[in-house]
Regions:
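Conserved core of the sugar-phosphate nucleotidyltransferase
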Residues: 96-167
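N-terminal glycine-rich phosphate-binding loop and ensuing alpha1 helix
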Residues: 1-40
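Short, high-confidence coil segments that cap the C-terminus of an alpha-helix
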Residues: 33, 81-83, 110-114
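Short phosphate-binding loop-to-helix
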Residues: 44-89, 93-103
């Protein structure tokens, strides 16, 4: 979103001469997981995404979350409902590794799993206590790389031993 509170204009932030959204699209293409589209509310972001070779769909900014934006975009992009898996990659994650994007799809091969999301350990204590970061209570066991997400919160999540997770 262009109106991001911590970094206004973030999707167009210049990273080595290209907008952030172009780098995110590069990572998604490198993952090779399927067709790409950028859902956004602002024409400036759409123009940058098109310049980077992406299909775009403008979605009104009255949605409460990125997930809601994706749902609206899919109604326009896939009205027949042909796609049964959608990866919601936020446009402010230019450092995501392509193998991470591929890995998020693995749990969806289990027919009892409807949704997957990535989490990472909270590295900065301040992130655990700010409402600008979504935290996830996960039920990881042992060295498992996949776990049920129990709930998400912008408030601090109480925890015992082990890492706390950022969504």
């Amino acid at each position: 979103r262009m109106a991001a509170s911590r970094l206004p204009g973030k999707p167009l932030a210049d990273i080595h001469g290209r907008p952030m959204i172009a780098h995110v699209l590069d990572r998604a293409r490198e993952a090779g997981i399927g067709p790409l589209a950028v859902a956004c509310a602002e024409e400036e972001i759409a123009a940058a995404a098109r310049a980077a070779g992406a299909q775009t769909v403008l979605v009104a900014d009255d949605v409460p979350s990125g997930t809601d934006r994706v749902q609206r975009a899919m109604k326009a992009l896939d009205p027949a409902g042909e796609f049964d898996v959608v990866v919601n990659l936020q446009g402010d994650f230019p450092t995501i590794r392509p193998e991470t994007l591929r890995a998020v799809l693995a749990p969806l091969e289990d027919p009892s799993v409807d949704i997957g999301t990535l989490v990472c350990p909270i590295a900065n204590e301040a992130e655990a206590h700010t409402d600008s970061f979504v935290k996830c209570a996960c039920a990881f066991t042992g060295d498992a790389m996949v776990a049920p997400a129990l709930y998400f919160s912008r408030l601090p999540i109480p925890w015992g031993e082990g890492p706390r997770w950022h969504h």
